[in-house]
């Protein structure tokens, strides 16, 4: 209609960044092959050990995928006891991306995992990078880290149940290592985009880390049921100006 698009989706669609055939979504059907190593002493609340995994997801068209792709994902987690099982330093490192052609745009946010569990929708939020807005970080090749200091400061019994209270402080971050080059396509459009920030639309720009920090309290019952309350705050207001409160179960990793 000649008017400037009023949403990013409309802008990317009109510029051809999102192809017309992908604009209404599609199907993703994949086969995953990988390896996992797990030496944690307790699955729910580990105090020592390593939990590492690597996998490749194949999603060819002949098994029903609308736009074929191949994705890899590598995750390393380590639990380091500092003082017995009372004070533990834990960290998680992740790097993932696509081999060959880029996938459809609607596949980019998903963080695929190996083993039991479910795929996560984008980086940002309780299951990936606390303090950041959900889906804040997306790209062809991406990575994130979580670091956490866990302190079990008191134990007691209630109704014959073992109860532990624990505090934690965390520092998380994520970054795009390879983005999608959209700058040239957008600049070809004469849409009056004088205020559009093209710095965020080039794969040649080195993205910075999107960082956040915070802390939380956990109630651990019988070493296997955990109630968690955490608050995270992003360092940059563009990543999340308000901070985020999480009430959930278990540890992040």
Please report, for each region that a protein language model flagged, where it lies by residue.
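Subset of outer-membrane beta-barrel
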Residues: 1, 217-220, 226-228, 232-234, ...
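Outer-membrane beta-barrel transmembrane domain signature
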Residues: 2-12, 21-22, 86, 166-213
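Outer-membrane beta-barrel "beta-signal"
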Residues: 219, 241-253
